[in-house]
Amino acid sequence: MTNNYNLGYACINTELSSRKVKVSTNRTMRRKTFDEKGLDYVSEIILQNVTDLLAILKWNADNDIHFFRMSSEMFPWASEYALEDLKDFDKIEEALFKAGLFAEENDIRLTTHPGPFNKLCSPNEQVVLNTIKDLEIHGRMMDLLCQPRSPWAKINIHVGGAYNDKPMALANFCKNFKRLSDAVKTRLTVENDDKESLYSTQELYDGVYKVIGIPIVHDYHHHTMCTGGLTQQEAVELALTTWGD
C-alpha cells in the first residue's frame, strides 16, 4: 500500500545532536558573545551549521525521512550583517549548494518557520521593517540552497497579531506582503493560530488567501483551540483548496 503523506520533523535531530561529536544546525550565541567575538566567529559558527545540514539530510535520507524544517538559528544575528561580509562566505555558499542539491536528488522537502516576532500585520513600521529583513534572510537562504521559488520550499509564518482590529491587521499583512522580494513572496505561507483572539483557517482564507493568494498551512492542534466554526475535516479541506495542484 502506497502512503500519500510525507512525515518529517523540525530543526533538531536528537540522534545526531547527542553524539560525542555533535551534529547540529542550531549553534548560536548571545548578543554579548556576538559583540565581543565579531563576524569572524559568527562566520565559523555558520559554516559549522551549514556543513552539518548536509549530514542531517543524509541521515534523514538513510532513515526514509523526506521532510525537514530547517532551523532559523542557522545564521546567528543575521540581521546585523550581510552574508557576503563573512570570511567564510564562499565555503558557506558551497555547503548550502551541496545540501540543496542533495535534498533535490533525494526528494527531501526543505521548509522554514521564522519566529513569532515576525509581524507583517503590525501598525508599527519598525516592526514591519524588522520582519521584512528577517523574511528576506530566509528567502536568501532558500535561494542559496537552490530551492524552488514556490510554496514547496515554504517560508511559513503567522499573521502576527490582531491589535484589537482584525480587519486592519489582515489588511496590513496583505499590504506589507507586497513589499517583499520574489524570493519571499513566492514561498510565503500563512498558518492558523491556537487562540480564538487570533486567526482560524477560515479567517485566513477570507482575509489573506482571497486577497493575495498565498497558501494556508493548517495546524491540526491549533485548530482545536481556534476552530472558526469549522470541523477539523472542513478546515483541512478548505486549506487544501489554497494549494492548487
Task: Write out the residue ranges for each language-model feature.
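Active-site glycine-rich loop that binds ribose-phosphate moieties when present
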Residues: 137, 164-179, 195-199
